[in-house]
Amino acid sequence: MKKIVFALLLAVMGAGNAWAQMEKPYNEEIDPLAQIEQAVKEAQQTGKYVVCQVGGNWCPWCLKFNKFIHEDAEIAKLVSDNYVYIHVNWPRRGGSVELQKRLNNFARFGFPVMVVLNSEGTPIHLQDSSFLEEGSGYNKEKTQRFFTNWTKAAVESLK
């Protein structure tokens, strides 16, 4: 029995240590509204859309998604070629009403949530990340489909 308890303790400690070592992409010190406006300016200059990955360093699924999209070469290229991608910090205990209004009440979906903004900064899609999940991670095909379907070229193809 002691061996089982010890093995479980080691497994829990290992999982916690792995989570603690993941990159922390959310900057808790910057103004998220100013961050979004800067990203929109960059999108206008580069002909891209903006993806705001809203969440926090406190959120294991947010960190998993960040790791997933950067470690998969195809997804990383799809994102970098088509989007200005930012991590918008949302405090664990809730953030500003202004940010919620700016990004169409995103918190109703849980975290992370991806908000796609067009080149003018208007939210055009909110992606509930639970639809991209598979098991204890994310599904590559669903994630690629999301990013492909919301590129500027795809959305504006009939204009």
Q: What do the predicted segments below correspond to?
A:
Residues 1-4:
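Positively charged n-region of N-terminal signal peptides that target proteins for export
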Residues 21-46, 155:
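N-terminal leader/targeting and pre-domain segments
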Residues 30-32, 72-97:
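Thiol-based oxidoreductase modules, predominantly thioredoxin-like and allied folds used
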Residues 38-71, 75:
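Local sequence-structure signature of Cys/Sec-based thiol-disulfide redox active-site neighborhoods
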Residues 91-110, 120:
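Structural alpha/beta surface segment adjacent to cysteine/selenocysteine redox centers
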